């Protein structure tokens, strides 16, 4: 298929979406809610099928954890938005004499990564259709079949519940030109960009409004007051969840020297493997390509599989590969984002030094995303939060699942804003609120 034909495909997709959305815009709240409920039910029913497909197609992660992600994206996201008013008058602020009216955006372009393909399609479809929008997905080619499968299930569920056909569509043969044509189309109202840094920057440069997210590089401070057993349990469960593929998973441990011995003991009890200098050097060369980009061959692989790829010998049951480090910089992959079960470990001699190390890690990469602290001191937790240039500061929980709202009360989301500090337009966990325009009728109060 030539690029001209692919661009024509975009025109057809947008025309279809625009027509369907114009019809859908007239639906009542009850009709919209029935459609969204059916999407939730059908995607929940197919959570395992979609997980198997995504794992088989991409080679990333674990089927069992992808089932959990798909279930989260359908069930927890649905529960968080099911009672949200999105049609007509959505709020009456009687004291302020203001009436708020919700209206849809129109056609949304949804960029889908290969790392969390089916869960992200489910999530974006639910919040788009809850707010009476149509959505066109630009899939990562590596996960095309899985994304098509998820979108087909969702489109069928919507139509079955009374929606007009064409609210959920996918670019059938994705290319950079096709994605660019979609993002720049004058009838696209918003780009919801989850993907690599270059793609997110392209979304913001498209001429259309966009909500994009930046890369993570989550530092984890384990301070001297922490419940060490709980902290290490959280770190290992989070970093091994779907083989570390969620961008909010931990990337570097920052440990107070006074508790380092116990931290190492607890990590080894959880089958973490501490690499020597030679092993660390071997793995280091494999983490990054010569261009400085993350090597896709290690993404979403288990620790033992990474070790085999690199040529180092570790026990088969190894959960995480750990390298002790002291330098932070773009040249050092152990101080950068690694979407696989590999961690850098940095030792500090005080809480204040730990805060500074975490700040330096976020400056190096992942500014605006997420930081984690394990502590029993509320004062330390708040101090850490005040100092971190991160949109989510998580306390005593898993990075991967806490940031998306699975183990915290943050809004359940698969799109995590990084604020202007991270090149994004919001620090929020993106949800249905962000896909709705709100008009306000305001009475004079003089």
Language-model segments: residues:
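Conserved C-terminal structural/oligomerization subdomain of aldehyde/semialdehyde dehydrogenase
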Residues: 25, 312-446
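Flexible, glycine/charged-enriched surface loops at secondary-structure junctions
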Residues: 26-30, 164-167, 243-246, 273-284, ...
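Short, flexible turn/loop "capping" segments at secondary-structure junctions
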Residues: 13-15, 212-214, 243-247, 332-339, ...
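ALDH superfamily catalytic-core signature
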Residues: 4-7, 122, 200-329
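Structural signal for hydrophobic packing residues in well-ordered secondary-structure cores
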Residues: 14, 18-21, 25-28, 36-47, ...
């Amino acid at each position: 298929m030539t690029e001209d034909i692919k661009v024509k495909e975009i025109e057809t997709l947008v025309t279809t979406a625009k027509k369907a959305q114009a019809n859908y815009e007239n639906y009542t709240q009850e009709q919209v809610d029935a459609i969204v409920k059916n999407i939730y039910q059908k995607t929940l029913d197919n959570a395992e099928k979609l997980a198997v497909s995504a794992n088989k197609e991409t080679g990333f992660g674990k089927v069992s954890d992808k089932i959990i992600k798909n279930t989260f994206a359908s069930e927890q996201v649905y529960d968080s938005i099911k009672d949200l008013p999105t049609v007509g008058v959505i709020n009456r602020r009687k004291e302020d004499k203001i009436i708020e009216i919700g209206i849809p955006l129109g056609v949304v372009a949804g960029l889908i990564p290969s790392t969390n393909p089916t869960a992200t399609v489910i999530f974006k479809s639910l919040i788009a259709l809850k707010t009476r929008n149509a959505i066109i997905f630009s899939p990562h080619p590596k996960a095309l079949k899985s994304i098509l499968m998820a979108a087909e299930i969702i489109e069928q569920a919507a139509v079955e519940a009374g929606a007009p056909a064409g609210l959920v569509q996918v670019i059938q043969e994705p290319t950079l030109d096709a994605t660019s044509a979609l993002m720049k189309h004058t009838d696209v109202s918003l780009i919801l960009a989850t993907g690599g840094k270059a793609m997110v920057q392209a979304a913001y440069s498209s001429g259309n409004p966009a909500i994009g997210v930046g890369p993570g590089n989550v530092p984890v401070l384990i301070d001297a007051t922490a419940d060490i057993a709980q902290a290490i349990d959280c770190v290992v469960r989070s970093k091994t969840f779907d083989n570390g593929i969620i961008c909010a998973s931990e990337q570097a441990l920052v440990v107070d020297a006074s508790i380092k011995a116990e931290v190492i003991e607890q990590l080894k009890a959880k089958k973490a493997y501490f690499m020597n200098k030679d092993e660390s050097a071997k793995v280091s060369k494999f983490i990054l390509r010569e261009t400085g980009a993350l090597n896709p061959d290690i993404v979403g692989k288990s620790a033992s599989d990474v070790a085999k790829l690199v040529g180092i010998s570790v026990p088969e049951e190894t959960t995480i590969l750990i390298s002790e480090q002291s330098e932070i910089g773009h040249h050092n992959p152990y101080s950068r984002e690694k979407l696989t079960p590999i961690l850098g470990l940095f030792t500090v001699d005080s809480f204040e030094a730990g805060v500074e190390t975490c700040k330096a890690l976020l400056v190096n990469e992942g500014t605006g995303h997420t930081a984690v602290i394990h502590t029993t001191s509320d004062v330390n937790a708040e101090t850490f939060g005040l100092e971190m240039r991160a949109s989510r500061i998580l306390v005593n929980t898993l990075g991967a699942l806490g940031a998306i709202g699975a183990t915290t009360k943050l809004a359940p989301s698969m799109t995590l804003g990084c604020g202007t500090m991270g090149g994004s337009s919001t620090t929020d966990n993106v949800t249905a609120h962000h896909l709705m325009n709100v008009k306000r009728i305001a009475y004079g109060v003089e």
